[in-house]
């Protein structure tokens, strides 16, 4: 039990930090407009990115991994139950190199050189991949052991089931590390069972039929719940051929109404 008197000092400090906040706290994703909304991925927090299948959730998470690896501020752990470590690495190689990932695409000499250079450039980057098919108690114990050996700064978990959210939130608190989980939903603004355990809820929306110049598809990242920052919409561009996400240059495209989370 905690008395009001004991909690007032901490609550006051949080309020002062919120009012005077300028830079994102915690780990930044490399997407400035998105980071301004969520205010960074904080240790112990659970963030969920939800969308219908095949809209780019995994690609978005891998772009975050790429940005972290290039800046080298933290060591990420990537978990996925639906793809093998080789398949995930193939996608990362596509994102890093910018070489089209289509299987019917013939590599040019320049693209072959880029792939070779990319392999050499990222070979020693600190990234661990877990492709276990089952997220059970044994899996969580292994994650705790891995964290003790490697001190991961961020855990990204793909293909998560809603029933795993309470345990993931508990794990984030135990390890004092942010967890970024990806969930598939059947509808555009689908309800996420177990979302009461989640600190930040994000939906990714993309119209597969809509593309702009140079094959860029507009994407909306909608922050619908945020215990640490703002709610609102961030605009990004997605390039399906290379699986890359990029900020929309014009900041006016990110000026959807934002409101402080209360």
Annotate the PLM regions:
Residues 2-99, 194-195, 261-262:
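The Walker A/P-loop phosphate-binding site
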Residues 162-170:
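Conserved Walker B catalytic segment
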Residues 156-158, 178-184:
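Structural recognition of the conserved hydrophobic beta-strand(s) that form the central parallel beta-sheet
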Residues 36, 72-151, 234:
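Cytosolic-facing regulatory segments adjacent to core modules
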Residues 80-83, 181-187, 207, 227:
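A short beta-strand-to-loop transition that corresponds to the Sensor-1 phosphate-sensing loop
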